[in-house]
Amino acid sequence: MPDVPIGPIYAYDTEFLEDGRTIELISIGIVCEDGREYYAVNSDMDHKRIAKDDWLCQNVVPHLPLSGKGYRGVNPYKSDTGRWVWSLDTKSTLVKPKWVIANEVREFLLAVDPPQLWANYAAYDHVVLAQLWGRMISLPKGLPMFTHDLQQLLETMADFEKPEKDGTEHNAIEDARWVMKVLRAAGKVPSA
């Protein structure tokens, strides 16, 4: 087997809408071991379906770029009909069509040698990442067909105390930063 150069380590996280049959990107955050970061929110997300999902509207949507103050200063808020009301700030430079995100993520991850990808509970994250380009076989050349799972690493380190989270949970870029912080503390990535 030929030697394949091992490139930089990237920690990433996605937030997504899933219904047991499909998984759709809401946002993606990526942190490279060299300090570069990427964060984007999918302007093509299915707003109506997300507005019906209590968990997403309580845990993910508040961390997205939102416009306006909402009802009584709350954005998102639950209407009398039981539906969540919120408005994505489409003027934010973080909000982009999925095809733009796919191109930018490809360029970001393949800027150097083939990347080594890491995520926390990585299975769904890798599917969401791969679906930026369609089917798994459509992954851009150089992107791995798997993501290393932080939880599997932590299982092998019985006495390891992982660092506390600094930021907000279910915010893709903050979650990716935390994964990188854990990888550094575990000795998988040199200290910055």
Identify the meaning behind each predicted range.
Residues M1-I6, A192:
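Basic/polar N-terminal segments that are highly enriched at the extreme N-terminus
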Residues K141-K162:
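Short, flexible loop segments at boundaries between secondary-structure elements
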Residues Q116-A122, V127-L132, F160-A192:
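Acidic, Mg2+-coordinating catalytic module of metal-dependent nucleases/exonucleases
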Residues P5-Y10, E15-A119:
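Conserved non-catalytic scaffold segment of RNase H-like nuclease domains
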Residues M1-D3, T14-R21, F160-E164, L183-A186:
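Hydrophobic, well-ordered secondary-structure scaffolds
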Residues D13-E15, D125, D149, D175:
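Acidic active-site catalytic centers that drive phospho-/nucleotidyl reactions
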Residues R106-L109, Y124-P144:
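Substrate-recognition/cap helix-loop segment adjacent to the acidic, metal-dependent catalytic center
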